Structure formats: structure tokens, C-alpha cells
Regions:
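Beta-rich, blade/repeat-based domains predominating
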Residues: 8-22, 50-69, 74, 91-108, ...
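A short loop-to-beta-strand structural motif that recurs across blades of beta-propeller domains
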Residues: 34-36, 74-76, 126-129, 168-170
Length: 199
């Protein structure tokens, strides 16, 4: 049986950080500074405005939403009373923060550009931030070439990171405290750039 595709919703500028949650697809329309939720019926709800460009999305175990704020390198938390800074990523993120994945314990792994790639400067590798549920930020891994696009395996024991300018997917073992070890090549996608060409 052939697959049939159709447009569910349109009118967006540049969508990033898709996450499925509570029966809807949540996305960051980063160049329009807003977080949206798209229903299976095509309805679109504006969840949050983020003038510093939203990117990665996730949820804490209690249901509160986390949103990466790119240009000011902050992790925002959507509380009942409004939006609060959950963590400051500027000590680790050397340029814009980007994608994120949140585990079942509320720990967030957050990537960043590493450098201003639009400036024409050579690739500069960067670190991956681990944000604990209390907002404490530590370095989870080093020397990643534009980590942007991450997943945790269903058992939560392996983190896979797309290194856009490394042209590879890198895997790590996840310990009980969220720390990463046993870095290894999970897949090489040379000459394709993951997350740029749709890989």
C-alpha cells in the first residue's frame, strides 16, 4: 500500500525542535519567535513567544515545558504563573544554543552551535550541556561539531547526538546520574550533513 502525504498545517517560517506530546506535535518556529502545537486536525495553537528564538523543546516529569532560548543561551521553564529561567547555558554554550532532549528524570541535554557559522570562520567544536532538574548545568561531553538533533533510546540508556558538521551520529552510554561515557560512532553520514539535508 503506497504512503499518501498531505499538508496538515502551513504558514510557518522555519520549524525546529519537533516533539510529540499529549497527542500534538510541538514545534519551534524559530525565525518567527514562537512555540506552537499542531493537532491532528490541523489546528495550530500558539503556546509561547520567545523573542530570543526558540529551539529545543521538552518536558519535566511534572508536565512543565522546557524551551531552549537560542540567542541568549538560556533554558526557559513554562510554569503556571509564566516563564522562568530554568538554567543559564552561557558558561558552556559558546554561541547560540539549539536542540535538546529531556529524559524521564527531567535532565536536559542541550546542544549549541559552537561558533558563528555564518561568519565564514572554520568549524569550532563545542560541549554538550547537561541541565539537572534543579537547574544546575555541567558539561556532559566535549569536542562535538555542531550538536543539533538528539534522541534517547527507549530504555534511556543511550544518547545519540547528530553532529551536523561532523557528518555523523555519535552515541554515548547514559549513567544513572545522567553522565555520559563510552563515546562511539553510531553512524557516518558522509557526505550528507545531518539535520541540514534532512538526514
Amino acid at each position: 500500500m503506497p504512503l499518501v502525504t498531505s499538508v496538515l498545517a502551513d504558514g510557518f517560517v522555519f520549524l525546529e525542535g519537533p516533539r510529540w506530546h499529549d497527542g500534538r506535535l510541538f514545534v519551534s518556529d524559530m525565525h518567527d519567535d514562537r512555540v506552537l502545537a499542531v493537532g491532528l486536525d490541523g489546528s495550530v495553537e500558539r503556546i509561547l513567544d520567545v523573542p530570543t528564538q526558540p529551539s529545543g523543546l521538552g518536558w519535566l516529569p511534572d508536565g512543565r515545558m522546557l524551551v531552549v532560548s537560542m540567542t541568549d543561551r538560556k533554558l526557559l521553564r513554562v510554569d503556571r504563573g509564566g516563564v522562568a529561567v530554568h538554567a543559564d547555558l552561557s558558561g558552556i554554550a559558546t554561541f547560540h544554543a539549539n536542540d535538546m532532549v529531556v529524559d524521564g528524570h527531567g535532565r536536559a541535554y542541550v546542544g549549541n552551535f559552537g561558533w558563528d557559522y555564518e561568519s565564514g570562520a572554520p568549524v569550532r567544536k563545542t560541549a554538550l550541556a547537561l541541565v539537572h532538574p534543579d537547574g544546575r548545568v555541567v558539561r556532559a561531553a566535549e569536542d562535538l561539531a555542531f550538536p543539533n538533533g538528539m534522541v534517547l533510546t527507549p530504555d534511556g540508556r543511550t544518547l545519540i547526538v547528530a553532529e551536523t558538521f561532523g557528518q555523523c551520529l555519535t552515541a554515548f552510554d547514559v549513567a544513572g546520574d545522567g553522565s555520559l561515557s563510552n563515546r562511539r560512532l553510531w553512524a557516518s553520514v558522509d557526505p550528507v550533513f545531518p539535520d541540514v539535508t534532512g538526514a
